[in-house]
Each structure stands twice: as structure tokens, then as C-alpha cells.
Amino acid sequence: MKIVLTDAQTVVDNLVPADRLSQFGEVVQYGLLTYDEVAEKIADADMVICNKTRLDEDSLKLAKNLKYIGLFATGYNNIDIEYCRKHGITVCNAGSYSTNAVAQHTFALILEHYSKVREYAKFVADGQWKRSKTFSPFVYPLNELAGKTIGIVGFGSIGSAVAKIAQAFEMKVLAYNRSEKQADGVEFVSFDELLERSDIVTVHCPLNSDSDKMFGKEQFAKMKNNALFVNTARGGVMVENDLYNALQNDEIGGAAVDTLVVEPMEEDCILMQAKNCIITPHIAWAPVETRERLMNIVADNIGSFINGTPKNVVS
């Protein structure tokens, strides 16, 4: 059994190795194959494990022995599902592994905006506290989360976890979800009402035809002029130029995003020039414990497939 990892470096490192997969066969790891390299490298594979590698007809057609594709991810829009169905290739994903991590990072971004940890740490590192006339210099204004209204767009497992943390901060929680849901202490409202009432708008929906470019000029204009926009979902849910303009024109108070439309970030990404904008490099999901959990799910999926009882099947 030959198992090929096509973009191992997106998950694997010295803290989270892939050695637990070797119980199932020979494991060949490639750090990050280009699209043009994939077809040749997986030609004799029985299984392919990937994260974001594009696996379409052209990259799969040489892999005559391929019976299984495992994903280091929940989303599978990089896989040609129809081709896999036609050729008897089982595709399994990994879900619900990053709920706590993404909720945690969401609040790391929110707290950075309101508590100014980065700015005050630099203030001290630059020696300015030593020169301060007071023990507590009010250089950057701070704000409490208690009493603020957070609006959660997408109320799946991550949105629900964010709501629970918000409640611990004594925040008012609004939520918008396309399907009807209920949760204690959460007021479900329309999308427009959420935009208009929220001090913080945080996005936790999948990227699909409904959510693509969901946040653009019109939506930012409906938000409070001191509101914080947070995106730890997918870059495609927002129009980056419109977010830039909303920030520059003081239509909203700030933005904190972990995902962009193009990743890694392009040299000329306009949000790098935006004011009051915090950007992290798509790492909300990536704590060591989270990647360990993901690796275990992927290994369990492989074992279940080999035993004839596949789980987490998407095709």
C-alpha cells in the first residue's frame, strides 16, 4: 500500500509528524507539490492524502491504482468529486477538529483590537514606559468587551463556540444562520439587523455560492462606524477592496482577518495598506493540539476505509 502526501508541510512538522500513517503502508511525503508535479508523483499511489492540492481529472488520470483520497481538511472543493465517483475513488474529509482553535483565535483578534496588547508591548520595548511621567500612560484607548454586541454570521460548531466565549465576557450575542437554529442566550436575527446592531461582526460560515463576496460595500456601509469586522472563515466571503475602502473612509472601526482571497498573501494585497487592520496568516486552525487531532482523524479515516467501514465520506 503506497500512501502519498502531496502537501505535507501544510500540516506536518517536527511537532506533528505523519509517522502514525506508516501503520497502513509505505508513506511518501512531499512538502508542497506544484499542480504540474502532482500527476507524476501520485501515478502509482493507492492512497493520496492532501490538504489544498488540486486533484482534478488531469492530475488523477495516471493514478490507476488510486482507491482513496483523504483530506487534511473539512472542505473538498479542490477535489474533482465527479471524477472520483466515476472511477470508484472514495474521498473522506476531516470535520470538527478546529472548533476550539478557531474560536480561540477569533477572540485573540478581538482582544488585540480592544486591548491593544501589541501596541503597549512595543511601547514598553521601545523604552517609553521608562520615560513616562505616570505609572499608567493612556497612550492607546482601551475598551471592555462586557456590554458590547457581537454578531455571529454562521452558527455551526465554531459560531456556537464563539457565542459561549462571548457570553463569558458578558456580551450580547446576535447570530444569523441560513437555516433556523436556537441557542440559549443567543438572539437570531436577519443578516441586515445583525450588521446594523453589532459592535463586532465575526464570520464563521463556509465559502460557497451563497457566501461568496457576502461582505462588500453595501454590507460594510450598514455596520456601525466603530464596528470591528472579523473574518476567520474564508477570504472569499469578503471583497477586499470594499473592506479597504470601508476602513480608509471610517465607515467601520477596524478589521481583523486570518484569511484572504489569495493565499499566501500577494505582494500588492491592498489590505496591507489599510488602517486599523490586523492580518494573521491563516493560522487560526493550526495549534499543535489541533493538528494532532486532525492527524488522528485522518489516520482513523484510513483505518476505517481499509476495514471496509469508511467514515466521513464525501464521495
Segment roles from a protein language model:
Residues G31, F72-A73, I89-N100, N177, ...:
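Short beta->alpha connector loops at strand-helix junctions that form conserved
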Residues F155-G156:
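Glycine-rich Rossmann-fold phosphate-binding loop(s) that bind the pyrophosphate
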Residues H87, G95-T149, V314:
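Phosphate-binding beta-alpha-beta segment of Rossmann-like dinucleotide-binding domains, i.e.
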